[in-house]
Amino acid sequence: MQVLPPGSTGGPSRLFILRPVATTLLMAAILLAGIIGYRFLPVAALPEVDYPTIQVVTLYPGASPDVMTSSVTAPLERQFGQMSGLKQMSSQSSGGASVVTLQFQLTLPLDVAEQEVQAAINAATNLLPSDLPNPPIYSKVNPADPPIMTLAVTSNAMPMTQVEDMVETRVAQKISQVSGVGLVTLAGGQRPAVRVKLNAQAIAALGLTSETVRTAITGANVNSAKGSLDGPERAVTLSANDQMQSADEYRKLIIAYQNGAPVRLGDVATVEQGAENSWLGAWANQAPAIVMNVQRQPGANIIATADSIRQMLPQLTESLPKSVKVTVLSDRTTNIRASVRDTQFELMLAIALVVMIIYLFLRNIPATIIPGVAVPLSLIGTFAVMVFLDFSINNLTLMALTIATGFVVDDAIVVIENISRYIEKGEKPLAAALKGAGEIGFTIISLTFSLIAVLIPLLFMGDIVGRLFREFAVTLAVAILISAVVSLTLTPMMCARMLSRQSLRKQNRFSRACERMFDRVIASYGRGLAKVLNHPWLTLSVAFATLLLSVMLWITIPKGFFPVQDNGIIQGTLQAPQSSSYASMAQRQRQVAERILQDPAVQSLTTFVGVDGANPTLNSARLQINLKPLDARDDRVQQVISRLQTAVATIPGVALYLQPTQDLTIDTQVSRTQYQFTLQATTLDALSHWVPKLQNALQSLPQLSEVSSDWQDRGLAAWVNVDRDSASRLGISMADVDNALYNAFGQRLISTIYTQANQYRVVLEHNTASTPGLAALETIRLTSRDGGTVPLSAIARIEQRFAPLSINHLDQFPVTTFSFNVPEGYSLGDAVQAILDTEKTLALPADITTQFQGSTLAFQAALGSTVWLIVAAVVAMYIVLGVLYESFIHPITILSTLPTAGVGALLALIIAGSELDIIAIIGIILLIGIVKKNAIMMIDFALAAEREQGMSPRDAIFQACLLRFRPILMTTLAALLGALPLMLSTGVGAELRRPLGIAMVGGLLVSQVLTLFTTPVIYLLFDRLSLYVKSRFPRHKEEA
């Protein structure tokens, strides 16, 4: 039993050093809790930070954008605008479709938002057109969020109408029921229907009109209640053959009599089984397909949702015929899992590098084992807290743990180094542990709480960026806190049991060589420090120059928002002239698809043409390009995009816009490019005046590329100008005119066929094959007051005009969205400033407002708060250090080291060609916490030497620098090597991790060199300042 000296109190570590069994069991409990917690943690790409978003889609086939806006979108918007918690409301009204996207405040639960939306739809129902085929349908999904999974269903033996029917009833409904799925859309529009194509000449010859035919069909196909007979003993349900199920039955339907002879529908029309909408189509690798896109609910875990779908697929596909093939074209979780695996590997590599550094400095296996146990214990214990906080294993939390390897080992290194020093002086291990741990306890507490103080401002960041980094900050803070506990409990206890003077002095050739090298380095540092202390003003000039340089670099460095990730999926928009038809777009997409599929990096391609909830106009097509895995292709996604755009550029009449999908989706609408800027006015006329001017100005800016807008007002429209007096004289109303046109050209859904499994529509239209274009209007006939038929041309004049293809609103006012990318050599910050300058140059009137949207708006907000965030971190750290040291001066000395970290980080980012984005800023904030640790270790020992040994300030700080040089070098290298795997990351998701590593490695390299010399000089400067203040104000001395 070792005899303890009277002064060996051990501080807070004493109990744990003297009770090794209890300490071991306590640490085992932390380890076990962490292992169990890890098993329950979900896996995700990023923390769940989605805005509660709901999309409301209303389809009204045949309606123009004007009609959709006034009769459908506007009534809905008026009701939605009264909902509490609504952050933003945008809408898009195009031919036959109205899409309203509602984004709510982050604090509003999605289920509450859903209830409000349903109530608003109910309130608007009476204001909507009475002949809407279906009421508005809402989905808990962000339309800008790319599908988590895309499946293609093809068949070489069955028509697409049958394939869609089976997919809709047997597959899509089941997938929709999976927890986390927000919306399952079937692109391709091949819903089965009975199509009735009227022969205009035939019905005109018989004196009939399309309205006569429509009335006959709707009256012949009904499905309503008929009652029952209730007798004394038996009840009989009434039924009838009131339903027609097939095209053959409709063909035989009698619609009128001529001279006593029946006129059947087949006599005046082509009746066939077809698709409900013939202007919709989807292709998978150029083959006709039903493309199933699965989108998650905002906030749902993408990995868990995708796993549930994968488990269901084999069972669902078994119910389909053998000729129907289901192919998973894309699964976003594949890249997410790969990214998480790469980050986990980098975490393990960081731990290995840190342990290697410890061994290199200590050159003792028992001394290396101690921090080697402390590091994984601190990290694993963090998982237990993460479970209780509902966190996930994602790129940001794993990055926090990777960075934490350099942080958590610092405490253990400081404790071990201090205890080892006493053992080498001849102290018994137990006494050395008590003395060393007691002496260093306050330093550990100072380091821990000052470092956590740096993270506090991250917890109070607003909006989506704050939510995004909350898990990062809390995970890192928990790891640091557990590390402090381990370092004050387990580490000194293990030192007391595992270290001895003999083991520490046991050396081999490698140990002796390392020792000689360290001795020479420390001696050189001592000589250099002595010279620096003799020339303090030169050193202070260097420190001041560093501060100025950091400010200058901050102003000039390119700034961005969030790194552009290579997730292996590209979303695209194909744009054609505004007058393009469905047939021409289908032909164009075939040409484009052929070029894209020839690229060696492309694995699969899906394309979609037609108007629905996702695609606003006929002259645009949607594409999803799935790339081969990163290790199977030579180029990153940006190089592939450039190559594809070059390949398609030679196809006449098309413009291809591509952008890589991202894990972080802030936008609420699908855009052609990565960034958006809106121009809003009170009227469409005001927009039509300013949109071309602003677009031309933006297209001339070198800071922007691929500038486009969704303003399309050159679509061709046939204006039917009815002579109301003539129509009234003939007994023809405007409703008769609208009905006749709708019957002929609106793919009008006039009746419903009910079956046990699904409902199908009867579609009425004119067969325009022999009378294309405006000539088809000459075939329209209307019924006059006397029962005769009148050609439309007798009461109307047809004019061809230009009309908008879609009308967009933002918060109920007309808006145009400009989309743009940032070319190579420029940053998002450059682009934003160029747009703002252009806006000032144009001198827009007061009733025209502009605003950045999505990630560009978030960038503006983040950029505005970044400086305050760093200031808040410094202030928080000053307050904590001031409380711990009971001094106003010493915290300033410690914080004087911070500019060196900023200079190193910013220079490293510039050299690496990386932008100063949110990830890099987080790295700089963490550097503030790391770099000040060097100063804390120096100043703590200097103050102790002055207080306990009576040394002069100069001798005290000089000795403290030499004594603390080795642990400072160890902890800095440990932190640097913890960040090194992130900086050198090349796998999936490396774009997200690399800026953090670059900033930290650069900052640590520069600050390590400078702070070792500037800190002692600044310490002596403030010491003299403190003496001067006391001499001028003796009252301070008396109070002290």
UniProtKB/Swiss-Prot annotation:
Keyword Zinc-finger in record: no
Transmembrane segment boundaries: 15-37, 345-362, 367-389, 396-418, 438-460, 472-494, 535-557, 867-889, 909-931, 968-990, 1000-1022
SUPFAM superfamilies, alphabetized: Multidrug efflux transporter AcrB pore domain, PN1, PN2, PC1 and PC2 subdomains, Multidrug efflux transporter AcrB TolC docking domain, DN and DC subdomains, Multidrug efflux transporter AcrB transmembrane domain
Disulfide-bond pairs as recorded: none
Major site of localization recorded for this protein: membrane
Membrane topology category: Multi-pass membrane protein
Subcellular location: Cell inner membrane
GO cellular component: plasma membrane
Keyword terms of this UniProt record: Cell inner membrane, Cell membrane, Membrane, Transmembrane, Transmembrane helix, Transport
InterPro entries the UniProt entry points to: AcrB_DN_DC_subdom, Acrflvin-R, Multidrug-R_MdtB
Self-association state and partner proteins as the record states: Part of a tripartite efflux system composed of MdtA, MdtB and MdtC. MdtB forms a heteromultimer with MdtC.
Family: Belongs to the resistance-nodulation-cell division (RND) (TC 2.A.6) family. MdtB subfamily.
Protein name: Multidrug resistance protein MdtB
Taxonomic source organism: Salmonella typhi
Gene: mdtB
